[in-house]
């Protein structure tokens, strides 16, 4: 069995024996929607809120996410409710942009072999000391 190393998340003062829960909508659709969710997350005593800013779809006419506008919405709500923010990065061209707005960058399982993306996330987070969440499975 592999050894699991647990480290505290900076700036939150969390103990290493606590479970960190990330809650939020699949997609940031509006400032009102995200702020309502942020208020609920804060009321629950959680520290992190997540939301999708970029939502690539196979149908080019489907909602693709709000992009940078979603990142601005997330930052504003995070600041208002004292929450850390997290979103998935799927394109290496977005690494710096995402890092400029959120506290944590998420990499989904489908991008574990996307070495350009992983390299760029490494470069950006080495400079900014942002957290990276590697999400496998559900």
Short names for language-model regions:
Residues 57, 111-138:
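Conserved anion-binding
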């Amino acid at each position: 069995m592999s050894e699991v190393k647990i480290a505290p998340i900076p700036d939150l003062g969390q103990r290493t024996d606590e479970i960190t829960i990330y809650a939020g909508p699949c997609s940031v659709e509006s400032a009102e929607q995200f702020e309502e969710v942020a208020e609920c997350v804060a009321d629950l005593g959680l520290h992190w809120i997540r939301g999708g800013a970029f939502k690539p779809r196979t149908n080019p006419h489907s909602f693709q996410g709000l992009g940078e506008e979603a990142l601005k919405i997330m930052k504003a709500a995070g600041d208002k409710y004292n929450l850390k923010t997290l979103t998935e990065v799927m394109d290496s061209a977005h690494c710096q942009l995402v890092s400029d707005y959120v506290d944590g960058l998420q990499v989904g399982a489908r991008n574990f072999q996307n070495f350009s993306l992983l390299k760029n996330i490494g470069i950006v987070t080495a400079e900014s000391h942002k957290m990276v969440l590697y999400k496998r499975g559900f």
